[in-house]
Structure formats: structure tokens, C-alpha cells
């Protein structure tokens, strides 16, 4: 990536923290917009500019930017049933304003879509999944109607450095199990534990985002490993007692990334295996 002026929405969140860190190392000038509904000042990195701003305030965007990474949305699946107004505000109203401004200024956008759109039962799985799918479709439409340049990236169950900074119980199961083991309490498994996930290290997510920003193709890319593990297998890797709790609304059974297109088109190569990572903790 050549030196660019880049806006990262949600830059004080877990993924934003890691992305900005990498973008700065590559010599880019980076500004973050975050309303700190989930992000934290603990994620601020020296060298980046941080502005407390909702994406509905997209009128502040100007044509000095070369690229926008749009990560700043409501990101909780299960709570979205009770917080549907917030999810709509962040993920539909805010995103529309930002996308429309990017179209007006001819600034390309890399969007952090949700892999829930690609799973059964898809976009109707939860308010969160529906709104994220709506935004992805809107970006596709803006590409067709107005020539907006974009890529959409779908994340699969992110773990690794920085992701433990998600300040609520709706964290990655990896972080939950790690904390439960440290506190010497049983690992809690929702449902029967046979649900399978593609667990992706945050460094691999960042690799994919950088590649997507360098290769704007008006395309969609799944960022995962192409390998799935059941929650029971993840728990076994922690080698700690477990207990089962009732399933939650919005939980899905399976989620496996199909990364062939991403690898062939962008040169994406996942590097971290989740079981190896757990055993190194």
C-alpha cells in the first residue's frame, strides 16, 4: 500500500485498533471516527488522529481522503433484538450517510460486512444480520448506480491481540473461555457445543483488509481460514472443565469461510490456526 490519507470508522474498536496499527506502519496518514459506544480510548495509537464522531455526521468528510475503511457499526448479534433502535441508527442511518458522501466525493470504501449474511438462515437471523446485509446491498447498489468503488469483506469469528478489549460479555468464545480458565470457573458452552465456527486471527483479518484496500474490484471477500472447529473442540483445547447453558436467540449453528476467491483474487493467505493459538496461551 502506497502512502495514503485514510479514514477508519470505528478506529477505537478491536479491529480498528489493529488496522490502524498496521496502516501507520505502512506509512499512511490515518484518522479515526468513533462515537465510543463500543470503542475505547485505550485503543488509541500514537500517530493517528481520533475524532469523536457518529457516521451520521459524514458531511465532515472531505475529498482529501484516498480511502475509507468502514468498521464503525453496531456489532452485537444477540443484544440487537433488544437494542434494535441503536442497531438501525448505527448500521443503516449512519452507514447510508457515509456511503452517500463517499459517492459524492468519489472516495472508495472497504466495508466490514458480517458473515451472518452468508450463513443459514442468513440476513433474517437477527436485526444485526439484517441491517448489516442491508448496508452491503446498498454499497453494491451504489457501485452499480453511481460507480462507487468498493470492496466488502466478511469477517469470521475474530480472535487475537486487542480483541479482548471488547468491553462486554458478547466477546469471542476464545476470550470468554480464556477468562473463565484464568478465573478457574467452568467454560460455559451454549447449546450442545456441536455448532461449528471458522476462527480467524485478527492479523489475518488485517491482512485481508489491507489487500482489499489495495485492490479495489467492487467485489466481496470472505476473510477466514477455510477450516471449522466445533465449540466443543475449542473447549477441549483449553483443557478445562465445562458446563452447558441454554442457547441464545440469534446464535447460528455453523459458519465456514469460503476463502478460495479471496486467495485467488487478493493473494490472501491465513497464517494462524486457532488450536495452536489456544495451546500457546
Residue ranges and their predicted role:
Residues 181-281:
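C-terminal substrate-binding subdomain of Rossmann-fold SDR/epimerase-dehydratase oxidoreductases
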Residues 123, 166-170, 227, 270:
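Residue-level signature of the cytosolic catalytic core of signaling kinases
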Residues 21, 140, 175-179, 263, ...:
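Solvent-exposed, non-membrane alpha-helical residues enriched in polar/charged side chains
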Residues 127-129, 138-197, 202-213, 236-238:
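NAD(P)-dependent short-chain dehydrogenase/reductase
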Residues 15, 87, 131, 173, ...:
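Hydrophobic alpha-helical packing elements
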Residues 121, 161-164, 232, 253:
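Short beta-loop-alpha junction of Rossmann-like oxidoreductase domains
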Residues 1-158:
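N-terminal Rossmann-like NAD(P)+-binding domain of SDR-like oxidoreductases, especially those catalyzing
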Amino acid at each position: 500500500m502506497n502512502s495514503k490519507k485514510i479514514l477508519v470508522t470505528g478506529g477505537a474498536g478491536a479491529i480498528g485498533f489493529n488496522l490502524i496499527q498496521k496502516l501507520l506502519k505502512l506509512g499512511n496518514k490515518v484518522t479515526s471516527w468513533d462515537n465510543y459506544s463500543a470503542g475505547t480510548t485505550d485503543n488509541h495509537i500514537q500517530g493517528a488522529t481520533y475524532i469523536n464522531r457518529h457516521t451520521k455526521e459524514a458531511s465532515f468528510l472531505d475529498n482529501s481522503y484516498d480511502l475509507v475503511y468502514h468498521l464503525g457499526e453496531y456489532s452485537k448479534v444477540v443484544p440487537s433484538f433488544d437494542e434494535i433502535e441503536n442497531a438501525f441508527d448505527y448500521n443503516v442511518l449512519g452507514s447510508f450517510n457515509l456511503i452517500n458522501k463517499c459517492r459524492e466525493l468519489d472516495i472508495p470504501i472497504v466495508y466490514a460486512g458480517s458473515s451472518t449474511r452468508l450463513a443459514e438462515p442468513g440476513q433474517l437471523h437477527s436485526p444485526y444480520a439484517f441491517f448489516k446485509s442491508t448496508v452491503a446491498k446498498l454499497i453494491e447498489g451504489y457501485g452499480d448506480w453511481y460507480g462507487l468503488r468498493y470492496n466488502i469483506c466478511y469477517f469470521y469469528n475474530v480472535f487475537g491481540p486487542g480483541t479482548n478489549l471488547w468491553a462486554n460479555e458478547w466477546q469471542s468464545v476464545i476470550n470468554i473461555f480464556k477468562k473463565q480458565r484464568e478465573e478457574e470457573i467452568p467454560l460455559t458452552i451454549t447449546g450442545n457445543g456441536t455448532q461449528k465456527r471458522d476462527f480467524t486471527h485478527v492479523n489475518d483479518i488485517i491482512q485481508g483488509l489491507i489487500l482489499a484496500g489495495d485492490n479495489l474490484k467492487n467485489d466481496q471477500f470472505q476473510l477466514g481460514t477455510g477450516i471449522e472447529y466445533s465449540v466443543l473442540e475449542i473447549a477441549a483445547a483449553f483443557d478445562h472443565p465445562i458446563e452447558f447453558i441454554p442457547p441464545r436467540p440469534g446464535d447460528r449453528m455453523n459458519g465456514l469461510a469460503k476463502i478460495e476467491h479471496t486467495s485467488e483474487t487478493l493473494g490472501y493467505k491465513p497464517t494462524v490456526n486457532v488450536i495452536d493459538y489456544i495451546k500457546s496461551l
